[in-house]
Amino acid sequence: MAPDLTILYGAEIYYTSDVLEKLENQVIPSLNGTRYALIEFSMATPYREIHTALSNLLMLGITPVVAHIERYHELENNEKRVKELIDMGCYTQINSSSILKPKLFGDKYKFMKKRARYFLERDLVHFVASDMHNLDQRPPYMKEAYEIVSKQYGESRARELFIENPRIILADQII
């Protein structure tokens, strides 16, 4: 028997100049109608642009969840910058595939795995999510990632990243 599954409305939003207007007019969705929006940038977006974009979202009353922070070159091994984003009111997310061991997912994106570990070790991550686009090329691997986080950082931390924090924001509450 399959577990109960509830699908909630939301999207990963690639940040462009018209995102603020589209969010304000509800043309693109926040996460389940909450104050939270999952925001993605190009891997090569300069930090100043990331910071400005997130500041603009916050001024609009949208709380950004910065998608897969391990991808952004400007945040690599930069605890200060990630803390600055968190301190201004943002939350951060890493992908489950960035936690996996090479035998499960390959070694193509080793640099992302190192970055994800760096952020996890410094308690700079609020969520782990799948970034799943399809089952063939990008399966979720959530169970495998949960087990690794639980083993390396403790069951409590795994529950927080995979279960508790997502429930909190979907209820439109503050972590």
Question: Predicted regions: what is each one?
Answer:
Residues 142-175:
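Mid-to-C-terminal alpha-helical segments outside catalytic/metal-binding sites
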Residues 1-93:
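Extended substrate/RNA-proximal surfaces in nucleic-acid metabolism proteins
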Residues 89-103:
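His/Asp/Glu-enriched short active-site or ligand-binding loop at hydrolase and phosphoryl-transfer sites
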Residues 122-139:
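Short acidic/histidine-rich active-site segments
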Residues 14-16, 71-75, 99-102, 133-137:
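Active-site environment of divalent metal-dependent phosphoester hydrolases
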Residues 101-105, 109, 136-140, 170:
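Short active-site-adjacent structural elements
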Residues 68, 131, 166:
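Conserved, mostly hydrophobic/aromatic
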